[in-house]
């Protein structure tokens, strides 16, 4: 039986491990903290099939002065970190044009359009099935003018076959009074889903993996190297492990692990925040993206999660108050009557490459090391399918998308 090591126990790593295990491989997951302790824990829980518009887009350039100078900006920069990330930022912002947005949409759609079905297939026969539900994902616009300013965005989604319905905000509030008097226009995206507790979902999947004979090692990975044409060595804190293949999928921490391979990897953390309102006095019925404020309100089991924003401050900086205060102040202004038992604050690291596409494929000519990371805001959405693709690559099955779009060496000169 061939042995495989998966580095990373987020949704991408756990999904990969389960699909490989189902195909008959002996699989070990290594993670420095354990399953779903990063972005897979604290995301908004949306299976966002329509999220084919990257963060760097024409509107980002138009609003950049506001984002840099306003305390109400949904994009945050730690000024002392800017010099370090300046080359990344220049390349990242250079993608903020229609040609690059169209390219991204064309390449991301095949990875996420069937996200709910992919997650249902992944979770089938496990205790994690109960966390998945079909759910419209809504976008709220405070004015009709704001909606019309986004017309190109919706035309692009329509072009890629993503169904949606535009409804009057007042009529919508009859269905969901939580959002009463907030929006003139609401767009309901169909064929979407929700994970009711993303962290517990991934942990439950990992528990299933372990129950089927998989292994989980909690350790930092110090090095990976090729032993010979058949084996790869992974050095962890207290041991060295040998496997036939290694999958590198620790999200924003991938760059450090792969540094020795000298592959060009313009990767940064798009830091995201959430505030949870535990046992609130009233709930929304559906998840809502507040388009002007760039955060999502998601009803979850026993709480409301308010998640979003983008912050560039690196992996080492701890939670910062300005993004959290912005989320809390916005909720206080929008929902003055909302009360809760407790508020829980969280920071996570989304792995983002300059073109916003993941790295997915073999790193070396001997096909021993495979990478799967860089899904930025869409790790949960694309995670189940990414795991299946990795499994298919190793087995040699046909893959029904153009895998070269995500090749690891695409940034090499």
Q: Model-derived features: where do they sit?
A:
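Beta1/beta-strand and adjacent pyrophosphate-binding region of the FAD-binding site
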Residues: 1-10
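N-terminal Rossmann-fold NAD(P) dinucleotide-binding loop
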Residues: 13-14
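Glycine-rich FAD pyrophosphate-binding loop
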Residues: 22-41
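Active-site substrate-recognition segment that forms the wall
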Residues: 45-46, 51, 55-95, 223-231, ...
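Rossmann-like flavin
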Residues: 86-204
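Flavin (FAD/FMN) cofactor-binding core of flavoprotein oxidoreductases
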Residues: 135, 140-144, 170-175, 269-270, ...
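A conserved short coil-to-beta-strand element within the FAD-binding core of flavoproteins
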Residues: 167-175, 217-232
